[in-house]
């Protein structure tokens, strides 16, 4: 289940941050493939970790979810309400694809990534973010069955309504515009220019979308982290997995300006600008 992948990523993040589970004030799990409708995967993860002092909830913003969660986490920290927040992006989308539908089954993946947010020195950490949604595109990427509108029954199962459906052309058209424009808004809010970006970590959906966003931001591809060829599209897990790999490979240096950018079902989009605070 998704909670197992979330647990493995969370343990690694806590170890790297040198934070115990009991120190966590909040757990946010971004996912569209929760273990079940209720309880939340975050509550299941809280129990697995032994994070008995943490509030816990799931967040459904699809591939934008990790950035949404990161924005929420840092607001709680900046206001002084909480000190340590765990944000996890976790998915098991292999369980939600129709294996006869090449629009989805060869693209979507399982995975999890996590980050622990806490207080950092002045001027570092989250500098700005941009979150957005356009519900008029709700049917562009959807799992129509299994909810209160189309509860599970024989007809919905026969019609694969519990599986992920995607209009690839519409998704591409939306993504190419959204990826670059949301980063530009975050840069503006941070008082920065696109030339100030040291590294872009985009949602790993499609290499052409990533290249298009990089071109719009005038970024050479050597400043853009890409690992889609290894994992495919892991939805909410894609950005934290990429961020962890970029960090572990020594690509993220303290003081550098890092941009995260995602888009997904909803339709949703999100970006944030960080000044990397972690030592090598």
Model-assigned labels for residue ranges:
Residues 1, 101-173, 177, 181, ...:
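Condensing-enzyme catalytic core mediating Claisen C-C bond formation in acyl metabolism
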Residues 1-25, 149-198, 209-217, 242, ...:
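Conserved active-site "lid/cap" helical segment
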Residues 1-4, 31-85, 215-242:
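Conserved catalytic cysteine-centered active-site region
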Residues 13, 24-27, 45, 69, ...:
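Buried hydrophobic positions in well-ordered alpha/beta secondary-structure cores of metabolic enzymes
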Residues 20-26, 53-55, 83-85, 193-199, ...:
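Short acidic capping loops at alpha-helix termini that bridge into adjacent secondary structure
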Residues 30-35, 61-64, 89-94, 132-134, ...:
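Acidic, glycine-rich active-site loops and adjacent beta-strand->loop/helix elements
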Residues 78-112:
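Flexible, glycine-rich active-site loops centered on histidine and acidic residues
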Residues 241-261, 267-280:
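Catalytic phosphate/nucleotide-handling subdomain of diverse soluble enzymes
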């Amino acid at each position: 289940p998704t909670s197992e992948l979330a647990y493995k990523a969370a343990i690694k993040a806590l170890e790297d941050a040198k934070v115990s589970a009991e120190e966590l004030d909040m757990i946010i799990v971004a996912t569209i493939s929760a273990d079940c409708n209720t309880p939340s995967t975050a509550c299941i993860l809280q129990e697995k970790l032994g994070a008995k002092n943490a509030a816990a909830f799931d967040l459904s913003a699809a591939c934008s979810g990790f950035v949404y969660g990161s924005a929420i986490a840092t607001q709680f920290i900046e206001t002084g309400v909480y000190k340590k927040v765990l944000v996890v992006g976790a998915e098991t989308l292999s369980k939600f694809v129709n294996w006869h539908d090449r629009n989805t089954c060869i693209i979507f993946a399982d995975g999890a990534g996590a980050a622990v947010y806490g207080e950092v020195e002045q001027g570092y950490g989250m500098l700005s973010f941009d979150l957005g949604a356009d519900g008029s595109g709700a049917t562009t990427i959807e799992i129509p069955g299994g909810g209160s509108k189309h509860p599970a029954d024989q007809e919905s199962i026969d019609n694969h309504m519990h599986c992920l459906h995607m209009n690839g052309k519409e998704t591409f058209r939306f993504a190419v515009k959204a990826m670059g424009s949301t980063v530009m808004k975050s840069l503006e809010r941070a008082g920065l220019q696109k030339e100030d970006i040291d590294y872009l970590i985009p949602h790993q959906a499609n290499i052409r979308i990533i290249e298009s966003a990089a071109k719009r931001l005038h970024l050479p591809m050597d400043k853009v982290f890409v690992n889609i060829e290894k994992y495919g599209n892991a939805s909410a897990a894609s950005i934290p997995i990429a961020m962890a790999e970029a960090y572990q490979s020594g690509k993220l240096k303290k003081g550098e300006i890092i941009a995260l950018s995602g888009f997904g079902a909803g339709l949703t989009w999100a970006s944030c600008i960080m000044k990397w605070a972690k030592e090598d």
